[in-house]
Amino acid sequence: MELGLWLLLGLTVTSAAAALPAQPGNAGQERGPGRSGDQEEKRVPAHHRPRRCTCFTYKDKECVYYCHLDIIWINTPEQTVPYGLSNHRGSLRGKRSSGPVPESSQSSPQTRLRCACSGVDDKACAYFCAHVTSYSRRAEKAAAEEKQETGGPRQRLKSRTDKVHQP
């Protein structure tokens, strides 16, 4: 039985070694993960797609897909989550004492933008960012209806331990 096992192990190692192609001149060199020999020799730069625009909310999946072409999408059990998005509001925030910002996210729903374009001359992006989708309107309507039904934001239920710890 042991002889058959050793024979099987030897054949497996031999066939695995024969399956690897011989590489002249690279016998002792290791390559980094994900690099092929052609890329190392040609020194091809990594392909980078610039961000077209920046979304004001990551809940707007259509906007995230349109604007952030180079993000990595991770599938989680609950939902698909965007990974690698930058802080989009940092450059748009003004000082509190400077007065109202013309394109503030707190303006009326008719003038609210869904994203900010990177290029000033990109008319397609400007059109996309200026229009609110029906999905966003439905989400806002549902939130307003919930607020109206409950009389405000959801209240935390008190437990028996809350009653005991009151002063």
Curated annotation (Swiss-Prot):
GO terms for molecular function: bombesin receptor binding; endothelin B receptor binding; hormone activity. It holds the Pfam family Endothelin. It comes from the Eukaryota. Residues 22-45, 85-112, 140-167 are annotated as: Disordered. One of its GO terms (cellular component) is extracellular space. Residues 140-149 have a biased composition (Basic and acidic residues). Residues 115-135 are annotated as: Endothelin-like. The record marks W73, I74 as: Cleavage. InterPro entries: Endothelin, Endothelin_toxin_CS, Endothln-like_toxin. Its main location: secreted. It is found in: Secreted. One of its GO terms (biological process) is positive regulation of cell population proliferation. Keywords: Cleavage on pair of basic residues, Disulfide bond, Secreted, Signal, Vasoactive, Vasoconstrictor. Residues 20-50, 74-167 form a propeptide. Disulfide bonds join C53-C67, C55-C63. The keyword NADP does not apply. Residues 97-109 have a biased composition (Low complexity). Residues 1-19 form the signal peptide. Belongs to the endothelin/sarafotoxin family. Endothelins are endothelium-derived vasoconstrictor peptides. This is Endothelin-3. It comes from Rattus norvegicus (Rat). The lineage of its organism: Eukaryota, Metazoa, Chordata, Craniata, Vertebrata.
